[in-house]
């Protein structure tokens, strides 16, 4: 196939945000998705946060790879240039993941959701964050017919 699936996401919020699951509802999935991840940070390659301790403080660690990365972090609003206000703001983060080596295949429809769960001083909680995402679909025309997909049950991880 000549199609490519890619996803980018930006998150602006305070405290840890990465416990929510990425869910891919494929070809008529209703209540339960065909693909359900283990956490937002896992989906973008963090596996165990994106931070390390430096002199007793938590420091975010950016990274870039060919297929996923975390290239952007800032707690400063670069658009604020005002004598009466500093540029502090809630942390902003930018991630990407290209589904080239692990395409999400579907015949009719695809719905992707992110569950917003975070951790604060009281433990896990449902969040309401500013999240923006972009998904790309590339396909050249004309093209040969795609091979039929296996049933969604046959595509489940083993």
Language-model regions, residue ranges each:
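Structural helix-adjacent loops and short alpha-helical linkers that scaffold large soluble proteins
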Residues: 12-18, 29-32
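Short linear, low-complexity motifs centered on an aromatic residue
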Residues: 20-22, 157
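Extended, compositionally biased non-globular segments
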Residues: 22-139
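Serine/threonine-rich low-complexity intrinsically disordered regions
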Residues: 9, 74-76, 151
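Intrinsic disorder/low-complexity detector
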Residues: 1, 27, 134, 139-158
């Amino acid at each position: 196939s000549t199609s490519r699936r890619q996803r980018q996401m930006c998150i602006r919020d305070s405290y840890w945000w990465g416990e929510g699951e990425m869910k891919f509802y494929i070809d008529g999935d209703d209540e339960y998705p065909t693909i359900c991840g283990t956490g937002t940070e896992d989906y973008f390659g963090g596996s165990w946060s994106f931070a390390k301790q430096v002199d007793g403080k938590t420091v975010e660690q950016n990274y870039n790879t060919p297929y996923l990365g975390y290239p952007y972090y800032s707690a400063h609003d670069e658009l604020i240039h005002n004598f009466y206000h500093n540029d502090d703001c809630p942390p902003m983060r930018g991630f990407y993941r290209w589904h080239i080596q692990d395409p999400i295949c579907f015949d009719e429809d695809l719905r992707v959701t992110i569950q917003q769960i975070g951790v604060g001083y009281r433990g896990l909680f449902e969040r309401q964050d500013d999240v923006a995402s972009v998904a790309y679909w590339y396909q050249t025309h004309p093209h040969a017919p795609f091979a039929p997909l296996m049933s969604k049950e046959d595509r489940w991880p083993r």
